[in-house]
Amino acid sequence: MKRFFSVLVIAISIANYSFAQTTKTVWPVMEKQMKPWVRWWWMGSAVDEKNLSQNLTTYQKAGIGGVEITPIYGAVGYESRYIDFLSPKWMDMLKFTVNKSNSLGLGVDMNTGTGWPFGGPQIKTESAATKLITQKYTVKEGEKLNEPVKVKEAKQEAAKLQALTAYGPKGEILNLLNQVEANGNLNWSPAKGNWEIYALFAGKTRQMVKRAAPGGEGFTLDHLDKNAVKVYLDRFNAAFGNKSQGIRSFFNDSYEVYGANWTPTFFDEFKKNRGYDLRNYLRELVGDNGNKEIIARVKSDYRQTMNDLLLNNFTKPWTSWAHQYKSLTKNQSHGSPGNLLDLYSAVDIPETETFGSSYFPIPGLRRNKEDVRNVNPDPMMSKFASSAAHTTGKKLVSSETFTWLTEHFKTSFSQCKPEAEQLFLSGVNHIFYHGTTNSPSDAVWPGWLFYASVQMNPTNSLWPHIDGLNNYIARCQSVLQAGKADNELLIYWPVYDVWNQAKGLDIALKVHDVDDWLHPTAFYKLATSLSKNGYSFDFASDHLLAQSTVENGLVKTAASASPYKVIIIPQCEMMDLNTFNKVISMASCGATVIFQELPKDVPGLNDLSVRQSQLKTALGKLLFTDLKDGVRQFKTGKGQILLTNDIQKALTYKSIKREELTDAGLQFIRRAING
């Protein structure tokens, strides 16, 4: 029961302190967003006003605060009831749902699509998810290529040749694209030596929308292409009549776009943002150079460009589109091939998820072996979403909760409660159950079901008792949504260490793969150690630090965010030169910056020797003096830079106190109200 007290006792103490000054009521006034919400699957969109009204009323009486509509495939045998997504009849059902929910005091969110990921019939081949296809040829001196330069992969008739680069025996590099004839023949032969030629085609992944609802079937869109995103959203504009539909928030599920590692404008965007022509490095891009350092640097630049494209061509435009309808965006950024912190920060409500069950040292708590996944839900993974909200001053952090917690109808509330509390402790304050299916009254028990759900359904035998769990979550969230996060430490996430790998191409940062990209890192080990020892913190990206300021010795990441006492730079190999210079500048302005180790190198390939020299010069200016306990100090301007392998010793030196309750196995979260 330790985790129960860790949430409840701290929450009550905050509530008493905060509200006693203005009212006799201990708890905040209950609002719908404080209650648990639920993902609400519309199977086949086979809905009608009678059953919608009945189900919404049932949810409201049980203490549910809102629904998140996600249309999916239909139930077999009920095809006559299916309604095509975004058709006039479907829009009538949406309007009825919103109006009925409003009358009941419920909120309505909506998936900006059906199933997952985004895609549908409006996405034709030219707007579909794109992948790069490479082919290698060898040409001898004085000879011509004996085959046309055409894509060999099956079902890639629409693939377009975008680059043809030849590499000579003495390091020569030639761009031969303009020497390819319309029939694919290469009108070129090497004058001396044997040459290797690499062709790059923009092909298509051919991925379809998974679990699509009627009217939502089709190709997955190219999330990296702004024009494709516009094509996708224009279908909604037409259905909505460019008018607000009363949706609180549009939702996007976790990024499960497989193999989409390219877009037709990639070369141009790469050259604009990275400063050199990727066409000259096709050999390195496919990993054939042999120089792993150069390969890793090129691929780091490639991955950073992927991040830029996803952020600027999809996430931000999608959010701007939602705002035009007076709605918010709620996004699961995990799984994306980009900087999760920046992607989460670009939306209104960052959303994490739990998948499978966690181990809790609670005597008698059931955990069946089939419920144990390859990776347990990790609070540090959830902190990527909560950090993005905290550092940008956003109020809500949501979670897709209890996904595959157990098998159908085997989930007890005793298993749900600690999972929810673990989310609260990671900064989540807006829980979405995963979930419930809209089931008609004439469906034979147990009604229509979705396979990955814990079945928060009225047909569940636990439903008569669900108000107890709902009320507990609502009371916790009513406090956790009050005020704002009050974490003291800001920990830099060295994303370039993740990107600087010679293996693979894009790196999808999935919750299921944290053993690969998160757990082995010094960043993760430091964060877990600080958490266990009673310190509270958020994570920071390069972009966040670039726009942060210093006021009275505290770090301000946003006008509406709580300030931070310290910036911590974990041990990292790679650090962007601009980021390094910025944190040094912030120290000069009065901030305290703690390095676990000084960075060793700069990422990327362009102007490498120049940037390495600049980093070396900047590092040479940091003349540290010894303090005590292995802590070294460099004073600069109004602030200071500390250097130590033991971050906790530096925090002790700065008189930043830890919460000693963690010594007893308790956990906590900090909130500030009127402060």
Name what the model sees in each region.
Residues V26-W42, F201-K204, A212, G218-K226, ...:
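An acidic-aromatic substrate-binding cleft motif
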Residues M1-T23:
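Bacterial Sec-dependent N-terminal signal peptides
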Residues W37, S53, G66, F85-W116, ...:
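Carbohydrate-binding surfaces of carbohydrate-active enzymes
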Residues T23-G66:
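Mature N-terminal segment immediately following signal peptide/propeptide cleavage
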Residues Q156-A159, A163-G216, N280-L309, S386, ...:
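Alpha-amylase-like alpha-glycosidases and glucanotransferases acting on alpha-linked glucans and related
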Residues I72-Q179, I197-A199, V209-K210, G216-L221:
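Acidic/aromatic-lined carbohydrate-recognition and catalytic surfaces
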Residues D48, T220-L233, P377-D378, H465-L469:
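Phosphate/oxyanion-binding active-site loops and adjacent basic polyanion-contact surfaces
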Residues W41-K50, L221-H223, L405-S412:
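Active-site mouth loops of central-metabolism enzymes
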